[in-house]
A protein has these predicted regions:
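Catalytic domains of lipid- and phosphate-ester/thioester hydrolases
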Residues: 1-178
Length: 178
């Protein structure tokens, strides 16, 4: 098997301060096994803690769609070290009609979508396009209008992206606390 499927371990070992990890593993129950494995190994081997306030990514048959991402705070242990952030993305299939029509149709016809086994190495054109389109939809939802005006240059700020992610996550978290 693999040591850690999301690439989080190596990025934390390199002391990255903003990590974006996309979990495309077959996880229909949203057990977050790959994320749990990464968080555990990072803590045990590197002494770095990753804290999530809450993960509100839901399995396909949930009554509410949940979110496509969660934000974790990376607590680097060195004196004076700044915290880092982990943006954890995971595909879902909301039943609220928000998906593009072709993706929704594919998902309704294929109940395992978007958590089909990776043992299937021969995706059809419609299957491949549905995954690609879902990924594009997720990025548009999570990053919103910030993707339309991407900053350029090697020193461009990421604050517009991060601000939209926090805006996307915050209302859901506030509503759930009530």
């Amino acid at each position: 098997g693999h040591f850690e499927n999301l690439g989080i371990y190596e990025m934390i070992r390199r002391r990255c301060h903003l990590i974006v990890a996309s979990d495309a593993g077959c996880d229909p129950d949203c057990a977050f096994e790959d994320l749990g494995n990464a968080v555990r190994k990072v803590w045990i081997n590197l002494g770095v803690q990753i804290d999530f306030q809450r993960i509100d990514i839901k399995k396909r048959d949930a009554t509410s769609p949940g979110l496509y991402c969660a934000i974790g705070t990376i607590k680097y242990p060195e004196p004076g070290a700044k915290d880092g952030y982990l943006l954890y993305l995971k595909p879902g299939f909301p039943s609220d009609g928000s998906l593009p029509a072709d993706v929704n149709a594919y998902g309704l016809a294929n109940p395992a979508f978007p958590h089909e086994t990776t043992a299937d190495q021969f995706f059809s054109e419609s299957q491949m396009e549905s995954y690609r389109s879902l990924g594009s939809h997720i990025i548009d939802v999570v990053f919103g209008s910030a993707t339309a005006s991407r900053p350029s240059g090697p020193t461009a700020a990421i604050s517009p992206f991060w601000a939209h992610i926090e805006e996307y996550v915050s209302p859901k978290m506030t509503a759930d606390r009530k």
